[in-house]
Amino acid sequence: MNDRIYLTRDGYNRLKEELYVLVHQKRKEVLEKIAEARAHGDLSENAEYDAAREEQSLTEAHIADLENKLSTATILDPKQVKTDKVYILTSVKLRDLDKEGEIIEYTLVSSEEADTDLGKISVRSPVGRALIGKTVGEKVQIMVPKGELHYEILEIFVK
């Protein structure tokens, strides 16, 4: 899967750091576990060895995934993002039409940078998909697992 992903400079650097830790620390730890398990003798019935090999497989898959993401990433400059419509890296101020006009703010980011605790939602999430391309004043109706959400877009800006 070679889909291009869009990241901020910070998001790109976080993925690079995660990859560095996996390659230079985690990989070595797993190899040590495998060596220790091998030292216990018969590998045919060695659960510790099997677990270490499984951990190695997962670690290598994670490394390959991060390498792929980093190689296909486009780093976006927030200064270049337009605010005429909702795009990736724009922040939107929304009025929740179901909760007495409660104001909500989200920043749309790639799946790799999404963090709902920080108000960063993925452009691939139901809310993100519904907001992309919309303009100030538009009302959106969004189907989510908990039901239906209704928002009005009040403002589009870049932080």
Swiss-Prot record:
Output the Gene3D superfamilies linked to this UniProt entry. Answer: Transcription elongation factor, GreA/GreB, C-terminal domain, Transcription elongation factor, GreA/GreB, N-terminal domain
Q: Name one GO molecular function term.
A: RNA polymerase binding
**Which ranges of the sequence are coiled-coil?**
47-73
**Pfam families the record matches:** GreA_GreB, GreA_GreB_N
Give any single GO term for biological process: regulation of DNA-templated transcription elongation
Q: Which domain of life is it from?
A: Bacteria
SUPFAM superfamilies in the cross-refs: FKBP-like, GreA transcript cleavage protein, N-terminal domain
Give the family, as the similarity comment puts it.
Answer: Belongs to the GreA/GreB family.
Q: What does this protein do?
A: Necessary for efficient RNA polymerase transcription elongation past template-encoded arresting sites. The arresting sites in DNA have the property of trapping a certain fraction of elongating RNA polymerases that pass through, resulting in locked ternary complexes. Cleavage of the nascent transcript by cleavage factors such as GreA or GreB allows the resumption of elongation from the new 3'terminus. GreA releases sequences of 2 to 3 nucleotides.
Instruction: State what protein this is by name.
Output: Transcription elongation factor GreA
Name the source organism.
Chlorobium phaeobacteroides (strain DSM 266 / SMG 266 / 2430)
Protein encoded by which gene: greA
